[in-house]
């Protein structure tokens, strides 16, 4: 499996058989830039905000996952779990869907724009997590300290932070916190990669926080 980060909450996850899952593609206004001719088999959108729902960037035919429930597409099991974009049950920013993907026997949890610490029902529904894709920048999502709480609630092998300030965001990025604050609060070891490539047999070799670089 390969995992590449395109900035914000957008990842391309490629299975060993070549199936591509794209999460939360954004519009160009962020300062990040997606490839012009993207191809994916599955595209998930956690909520309907423009920095997470630009499915038109994908030029191939694909299955769009944007609902709650259980799905099976291209040999990948997917589960959508109801959460919120804020701490007030969605009254400020609306709903958010966490998506679980089982790819190559590895459970990946993409938290979208999660705005709160999880409750016991949500933790149970999410279940076992091998790789957690977690917002850490605050402002529109959980901040670094609540992100650590969610990390401890789900106890993944690997945490990949997302939705935080980077140089590529320019002035827009100043509304978010830096990833360093989450790293410091977590107390975990950190590795950096341009792209993460792993499998079920060697996943523990990458345990802790993995920071993926934005090209």
Task: Locate predicted features.
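Short secondary-structure boundary segments
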Residues: 47, 136, 162-164
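Active-site-proximal loop/helix segments of hydrolase catalytic cores
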Residues: 88-154
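Pre-active-site segment of Zn-dependent metallo-hydrolases
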Residues: 10-62, 66, 82-96, 114-125
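Zn-dependent metallo-beta-lactamase
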Residues: 1-16, 69-81, 200-215
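Conserved acidic residues
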Residues: 40-41, 130, 157
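Active-site-proximal beta-strand elements of phosphoester/diester hydrolases
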Residues: 2-5, 20-24, 77-84, 98-100, ...
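Metallo-beta-lactamase
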Residues: 53-97, 101-104, 187-204
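Binuclear metal-ion centers of metallo-dependent hydrolases, dominated by the metallo-beta-lactamase
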Residues: 4-6, 92-93, 158-215
């Amino acid at each position: 499996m390969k995992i590449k980060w395109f900035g914000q909450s957008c990842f391309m996850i490629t299975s060993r058989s070549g199936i591509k899952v794209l999460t939360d593609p954004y519009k160009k206004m962020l300062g990040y830039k997606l490839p012009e001719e993207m191809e994916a088999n599955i595209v998930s959108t956690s909520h309907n905000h423009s920095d997470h729902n630009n499915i038109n960037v994908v030029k191939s035919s694909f299955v769009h996952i944007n609902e709650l429930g259980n799905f099976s597409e291209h040999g990948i099991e997917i589960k959508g779990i109801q959460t919120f974009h804020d701490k007030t049950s969605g009254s400020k920013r609306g709903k958010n869907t966490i998506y679980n993907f089982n790819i190559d026997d590895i459970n990946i949890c993409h938290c979208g724009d999660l705005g709160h610490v999880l409750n016991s029902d949500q933790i149970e529904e999410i279940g076992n997590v091998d790789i957690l894709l977690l917002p850490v920048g605050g402002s529109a999502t959980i901040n670094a300290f609540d992100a650590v709480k969610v990390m401890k609630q789900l106890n993944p092998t690997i945490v990949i932070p997302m939705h935080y300030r980077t140089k590529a965001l320019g002035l827009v990025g100043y509304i978010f916190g830096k990833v360093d604050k989450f790293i410091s609060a977590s107390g975990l070891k950190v590795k950096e990669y341009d792209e993460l490539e792993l499998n079920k047999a060697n996943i523990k070799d990458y345990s802790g926080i993995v920071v993926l670089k934005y090209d």
